[in-house]
Amino acid sequence: MAERFSTFHDFALAQLDDIYTEEEIDETLKFSIIELNSGVFINDGKGSFKFKKLSSLAQLAPGYGIIAQDFDGDNITDLLLAQNFHWPQVETGRMSGSMSLLLKGNGDASFDTVWPHESGIIVPDDAKSACMTDFNGDSLPDIVISSNDGPVRGFSMTNDKNIKNCVISL
């Protein structure tokens, strides 16, 4: 590329056929997208996987940070999605219809949506990653969600039924 473009500005303004020759384009691998839904792959135990689409609410925005964890203590894996995409290419527009989402596992490879106001996990930002930790030392898993050009948010789990939600923004 350095031989074809002397500045980043020239490269940014170039069309595809300015960047690559027809021969280079013909030799490239071409991919197609056949599934745009967010979902999970379920292992059938026989060496194959089946794709299962997540709920409609999970489709409102792409999920970037995903945690598979038993959040409610029922020994069934739940999912947490850190969602939104505020800065796609201009032609596509923002994909920011979510607050991030908790999906409660049912044990049969299906998940029920837990609304953000019920879970207490509300992240209206351009969320990009999620991880589990125990930042308060109580042996319960806590959640940390970071956002592109935004705050890092911590969500503290509790066994106290009198405490509805606890959020720590850093």
Q: Whereabouts are the PLM-identified features?
A:
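Beta-propeller-forming repeat regions
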Residues: 1-170
